Amino acid sequence: MLAANICAAEALSEHFPQAMYRVHEPPDRDAVTELGQVLRLFGIRLAPREAPEAKDFAAALVAMREQPVPYDALQALVLRCMKQARYSSRQLPHFALGFEHYTHFTSPIRRYPDLVVHRLLKTALGIGAKTAQAAAGLSLDELAAHCSQTERQAEEAEREIAAKLKAEFMGRHIGERFAGTVSGVTAFGVFVALTEFPVDGLVHISELADDYFDFDARLMRLTGRRTAEQIKVGDGMQVTVAAVNVEEGKIDLVRVRPKDDQSVSPVQSSRRSRDKKLRKK
């Protein structure tokens, strides 16, 4: 499949000044620098070059599998560093794949950009009844921008429905305790990926500890002013499911510390009972 897509892209570049390509631009230098600083906390180093190549990120991903920290949590850091692939009427390299020419000519699914490429190739071979532009009534610039936009919309719809279904599922586990791993750190709390289920939830910063936490955006780390406790991506954390909002696809978690009573407090019980009643309305 990859070889066919490369071959088609090369043919397009030989016959047309503009076509339909799948491009992926390199990550910004600042994003790479910040990623390297975070990965060093886990003993992982990106290649010491000014502009890391795709193979350097691939080597880092391999090194991540040797870490005690869950792979998914570290992989997410790399993905956040990357730009999104998109469609373009101008031929540009595909950074993540490491290809100079790439397009979507064939795949397990049939996309509209594939059809545009087919029409262009037929035009080049002299067997197409219509050019890609005439068939769509749009310029290639407009087609590429439109296909990129609708792809983002489809991805967002997929994420939204997945989040709602996960929230609905976790609504059956209110008050239950789970082991998890910190998958994201923000100024307002941490996201925890549960070990038992492929689900992430938010532990609000007010639920972390009896302390005030300072957020280090560069190292993605929270540090307690009084306790000096540090919370970062990859840390293990025991949590309890406190509440869910199915409509918004949100899951609220509460941190369980060793000194905490494992039973549900009256305040938590009251809040959860109230949330359940609200969800039934």
Label the predicted regions:
Residues 200-201, 222:
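Glycine-centered structural positions embedded in regular secondary structure
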Residues 1-195, 202, 209, 214, ...:
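Append "with occasional cross-activation on large, charged helical scaffolds in nucleic-acid assemblies
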Residues 212-221, 255-281:
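Acidic, low-complexity intrinsically disordered tails
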Residues 194, 233-271:
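OB-fold/S1-family single-stranded nucleic acid-binding modules
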Residues 173-176, 213-239:
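Short nucleic-acid-contacting surface segments enriched for D/E, G, S/T with interspersed K/R
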